[in-house]
């Protein structure tokens, strides 16, 4: 609890009230300031060294079923859980595009996955995913739809965006935030923390295990 509160104080929002809600998986922070309210969820931090769970999902861009084994990179595989409408994702989209494009020639495959419930959030449906990918210039190796949400659960994904970097053997070396920027703290979006992990991995240098959880909108889980 204390560590969560400490993080609240460092993300740069002008807080006047903090409400913690324990949903059994993660703490959700509700920030209320000057009439502004936003629910934020932290990533659950998959244990380092975990092997990437396999999957076979529908690619919204090509219309094909694609597996992790088909999409994995020669040097590294970056999996990002995103969705179309999330303000946290839209805030960092330029860096998401840049990282995918800049690291592809270095042997890094970048796979985006959307796991949101499209009944409640139709703007995240596959046809809308395909349109967004085209608008962004189709930067990812795939933009996959996790209809059953089983893949998000296998990766312990909790928020959008949620980042998972795996080495050439598909072992997790980084799970955490892109950088310190959020939609409300006015920090520049640089992607430096994820870039540092990518650069270390590609250079053969150990990735710093001190990693900070990502923060974003919660994945929109289907009603039970």
Where are the regions a protein language model picked out?
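Cysteine-centered motifs
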Residues: 8-9, 16
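Mature cores of small secreted peptide/protein domains
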Residues: 13-14, 21, 91, 222
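Chalcogenol-based redox active-site neighborhoods
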Residues: 34-211, 218-224
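Short, Lys/Arg-enriched N-terminal segments with co-localized hydrophobic residues
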Residues: 15-37
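N-terminal compositionally biased or targeting/leader segments
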Residues: 11, 27-28, 64
